[in-house]
């Protein structure tokens, strides 16, 4: 969730987010974020104005926590799929890639998807002059 966090708090600087196996789960929480990074899914994105983001996210079938249920909010597969659903509902420019038969950030997945991911997040980019 690090790339997303940078964009969320500094949308004036960051508009493009590329995430492999995004940690949108409840690993660390605080009084300000009782659900940890799951706050993006549960509260921040649903209740906030749309930001100028272009987001590409990927998760693998056998990613971290894939054998656990949703109740603990520590399943990367469920969290990334739910995040994609929130992005769709808010009409963000996003792509969600689900890699069947793969595990957490496997090299073969990155090798096969990184070119397309970079093309997607930089689509329609015009440099400032």
Question: What does each model-found stretch correspond to?
Answer:
Residues 1-129:
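Non-catalytic cap/lid and distal C-terminal segments of serine-dependent acyl enzymes
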């Amino acid at each position: 969730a690090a790339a997303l966090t940078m964009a969320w708090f500094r949308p004036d600087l960051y508009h493009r987010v590329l995430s492999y196996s995004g940690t949108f789960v409840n690993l660390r929480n605080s009084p300000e974020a009782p659900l940890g990074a799951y706050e993006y899914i549960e509260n921040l994105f649903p209740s906030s104005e749309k930001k100028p983001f272009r987001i590409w996210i990927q998760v693998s079938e056998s990613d971290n926590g894939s054998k656990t249920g949703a109740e603990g909010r520590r399943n990367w597969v469920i969290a990334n799929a739910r995040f994609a659903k929130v992005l769709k509902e808010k009409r963000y420019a996003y792509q969600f890639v689900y890699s069947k038969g793969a595990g957490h950030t496997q090299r073969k997945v990155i090798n096969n998807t990184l070119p397309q991911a970079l093309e997607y997040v930089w689509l329609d980019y015009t440099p400032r002059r």
